[in-house]
UniProtKB/Swiss-Prot annotation:
Spans annotated as Core: 38-48
Region feature Transactivation, mapped onto this chain: 1-48
Reported modifications of this chain: Asymmetrical arginine methylation by host PRMT6 seems to diminish the transactivation capacity of Tat and affects the interaction with host CCNT1. Acetylation by EP300, CREBBP, GCN5L2/GCN5 and PCAF regulates the transactivation activity of Tat. EP300-mediated acetylation of Lys-50 promotes dissociation of Tat from the TAR RNA through the competitive binding to PCAF's bromodomain. In addition, the non-acetylated Tat's N-terminus can also interact with PCAF. PCAF-mediated acetylation of Lys-28 enhances Tat's binding to CCNT1. Lys-50 is deacetylated by SIRT1.
Binding sites annotated in the UniProt record for Zn(2+) 1: 22, 33-34, 37
Chain intervals for the UniProt region annotation (Interaction with human CREBBP): 1-24
Annotated localization: Host nucleus, Host nucleolus; Host cytoplasm; Secreted
Region entry Cysteine-rich, spans: 22-37
Protein name as it appears in the record: Protein Tat
GO-annotated biological processes: DNA-templated transcription; positive regulation of transcription elongation by RNA polymerase II; positive regulation of viral transcription; symbiont-mediated perturbation of host chromatin organization; symbiont-mediated suppression of host innate immune response; symbiont-mediated suppression of host translation initiation; symbiont-mediated suppression of host type I interferon-mediated signaling pathway
Marked site positions, Essential for Tat translocation through the endosomal membrane: 11
Length: 86
C-alpha cells in the first residue's frame, strides 16, 4: 500500500471517491460502483422518506364484492343441559 498524506482528510484520500458519478442503473457493475451504490442498489436499503401509496377508490357501481354476514341463531348453552350427574 502506498503511504497516504496525513494532512489529507479521509474523504480526500486517493481511491476514496469513484471517478464516475453514481447513476440510477441497477446492473451488476453499477451496484458495485461504490459503497453507497452497493447499499442502496445491491442490498436495497434506503433510509429516505417512503412515498405514500394511493388508496384504491371504491368502484362507482356500489358493489363491495363482499357478501353480507348472515344472522346467526342465538348461541346454545354448551355441555349437558340437564346438569352434571352425581
Amino acid at each position: 500500500m502506498d503511504p497516504v498524506d496525513p494532512n489529507l482528510e479521509p474523504w480526500n484520500h486517493p481511491g476514496s471517491q469513484p471517478k464516475t458519478a453514481c447513476n440510477r442503473c441497477h446492473c451488476k457493475k453499477c451496484c458495485y460502483h461504490c459503497q453507497v451504490c452497493f447499499i442502496t442498489k445491491g442490498l436495497g436499503i434506503s433510509y429516505g422518506r417512503k412515498k405514500r401509496r394511493q388508496r384504491r377508490r371504491p368502484s362507482q357501481g356500489g358493489q363491495t364484492h363482499q357478501d353480507p354476514i348472515p344472522k346467526q341463531p342465538s348461541s346454545q348453552p354448551r355441555g349437558n343441559p340437564t346438569g352434571p350427574k352425581e
